């Protein structure tokens, strides 16, 4: 029986899962939006939500806890400076998961996970062009 066994193994060892989630959390905080498989998105969401809550706490111990989890000081400083101040008044629910079809090679369900009030410029020039094109299309319609 699997009573009380939460979380997905994602066909990886525990150390591989831990490293993958650390890398995914760092990428999500840096770019504020990533495309991944739906199960991975569902697993990374509570990890990043807890990191944002640590960022809102803002003290040295919280910063060290965040560094121990995602191991990238530049990303942690963005988390504590930019992202934590953006969500200072929001109590949870910092991320959204949107289904994004299926991957071409193996038909795996894809999802876009992003911050709710994300900074469009964080993703890069390609995303900025897409967002501006969508805005122009909505304006024309």
UniProtKB/Swiss-Prot annotation:
GO terms for molecular function: structural constituent of ribosome. Coiled coil: none annotated. PROSITE patterns: RIBOSOMAL_L17. The keyword Secreted does not apply. One of its GO terms (cellular component) is cytosolic large ribosomal subunit. Keywords: Ribonucleoprotein, Ribosomal protein. It holds the Pfam family Ribosomal_L17. GO terms for biological process: translation. Part of the 50S ribosomal subunit. Contacts protein L32. Belongs to the bacterial ribosomal protein bL17 family. PANTHER family: LARGE RIBOSOMAL SUBUNIT PROTEIN BL17M, RIBOSOMAL PROTEIN L17. This is Large ribosomal subunit protein bL17. It comes from Rhizobium meliloti (strain 1021) (Ensifer meliloti). The lineage of its organism: Bacteria, Pseudomonadati, Pseudomonadota, Alphaproteobacteria, Hyphomicrobiales.
């Amino acid at each position: 029986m699997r009573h009380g066994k939460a979380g997905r193994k994602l066909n990886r060892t525990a150390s591989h899962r831990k490293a993958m989630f650390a890398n995914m959390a760092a990428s999500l905080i840096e770019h504020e939006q990533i495309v991944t498989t739906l199960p991975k998105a569902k697993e990374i969401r509570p990890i990043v939500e807890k990191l944002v809550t640590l960022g809102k706490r803002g003290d040295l111990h919280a910063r060290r806890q965040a560094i121990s989890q995602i191991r990238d000081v530049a990303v942690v400083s963005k988390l504590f400076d930019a992202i934590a101040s953006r969500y200072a008044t929001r109590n949870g629910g910092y991320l959204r998961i949107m289904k994004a079809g299926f991957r071409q090679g193996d038909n795996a369900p894809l999802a876009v996970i992003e911050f709710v009030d994300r900074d469009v410029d964080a993703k890069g020039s390609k995303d900025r062009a897409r967002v501006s094109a969508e805005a122009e299309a909505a304006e024309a319609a």
